[in-house]
């Protein structure tokens, strides 16, 4: 495989550059990337340290830096080394400016914007933590999304990922031969999504979990027939109520969350007046 070095340089968390890099790398199966993360680069001294690293390990540079002088220094340095230096969002900003007719603001503030979106995200994260694994079922009416599924079908990490996108998400496990919460008998406005997985894959995940916890006796947890029944029962519950079901067998958490968000916003837009 061809090796590729990528330097992610940002005056913030490098998350934007990282997401862009991973999206691009997904198109190349024969590349073996090595990513270097350089977050919180907000002055010339910090940038100088990064430049020395870039010089010692040539590769593509992806950056999100607001300060004009730092950008100039970085791009000039890369130009002299004859390596690509790409601004992840400059093209987007330029097109927004052209389309809206509003000039790009020159003064940048490094502080996060403490607006409604910021606090909505904090509230969503808090909600996801407090309503994990079937907790506080009496507060489901405050959720945007409710996930149901057998244990170890990525309900918790998916809930947290959705919360980081501002969506209050509760998750409820389905356990074989245990009564399911009676909320399913009610007419609710929240989006309910069932998560299922290939039984063999789920057994592998559960066995790994038990080994990590050094638990030797929990036969029902990894019994094929029971695991299969759990997945089938979740499908049945959802199909009877026209709730969507997602098979997460071959999906990453990001992919699962993206599908859920698409369903959520399609539903929201459909009923928006």
Curated annotation (Swiss-Prot):
InterPro entries: Kinase-pyrophosphorylase, PPDK_reg. This is Putative pyruvate, phosphate dikinase regulatory protein. Its EC number is 2.7.11.32, 2.7.4.27. It holds the Pfam family Kinase-PPPase. The keyword Iron does not apply. Keywords: Kinase, Nucleotide-binding, Serine/threonine-protein kinase, Transferase. It catalyses: N(tele)-phospho-L-histidyl/L-threonyl-[pyruvate, phosphate dikinase] + ADP = N(tele)-phospho-L-histidyl/O-phospho-L-threonyl-[pyruvate, phosphate dikinase] + AMP + H(+); N(tele)-phospho-L-histidyl/O-phospho-L-threonyl-[pyruvate, phosphate dikinase] + phosphate + H(+) = N(tele)-phospho-L-histidyl/L-threonyl-[pyruvate, phosphate dikinase] + diphosphate. ADP binds at residues 149-156. It comes from Rickettsia bellii (strain RML369-C). NCBIfam families: PRK05339.1.
């Amino acid at each position: 495989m061809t090796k590729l070095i990528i330097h992610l340089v940002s005056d913030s968390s490098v998350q934007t550059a990282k997401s862009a890099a991973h999206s691009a790398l997904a198109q190349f199966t024969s590349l073996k990337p090595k990513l270097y993360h350089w977050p919180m680069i907000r002055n010339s001294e910090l940038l100088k340290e990064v430049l020395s690293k870039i010089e010692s390990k040539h590769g593509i540079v992806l950056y999100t830096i607001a300060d004009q002088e730092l950008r100039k220094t970085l791009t000039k340095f890369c130009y002299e080394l004859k390596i690509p230096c790409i601004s992840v969002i400059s093209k987007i900003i330029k097109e927004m400016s052209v389309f809206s007719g509003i000039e790009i603001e020159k003064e940048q503030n490094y502080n996060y914007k403490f607006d409604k979106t910021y606090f909505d995200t904090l509230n969503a994260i808090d909600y996801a933590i407090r309503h994990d694994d079937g907790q506080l079922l009496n507060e489901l009416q405050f959720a945007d999304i409710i996930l149901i599924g057998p244990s170890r079908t990525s309900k918790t990490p998916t809930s947290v990922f959705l919360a980081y996108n501002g969506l209050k998400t509760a998750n409820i496990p389905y356990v074989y031969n245990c009564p399911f919460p009676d909320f399913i008998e009610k007419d609710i406005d929240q989006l309910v999504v069932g998560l299922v997985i290939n039984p063999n894959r789920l057994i592998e995940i559960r066995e790994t979990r038990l080994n990590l916890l050094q638990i030797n006796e929990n036969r029902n947890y990894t019994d094929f027939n029971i695991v299969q029944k759990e997945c089938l029962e979740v499908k049945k519950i959802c199909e009877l109520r026209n709730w969507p079901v997602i098979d997460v067998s071959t999906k990453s958490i990001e992919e699962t969350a993206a599908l859920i968000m698409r369903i959520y916003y399609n539903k929201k837009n459909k009923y928006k007046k």
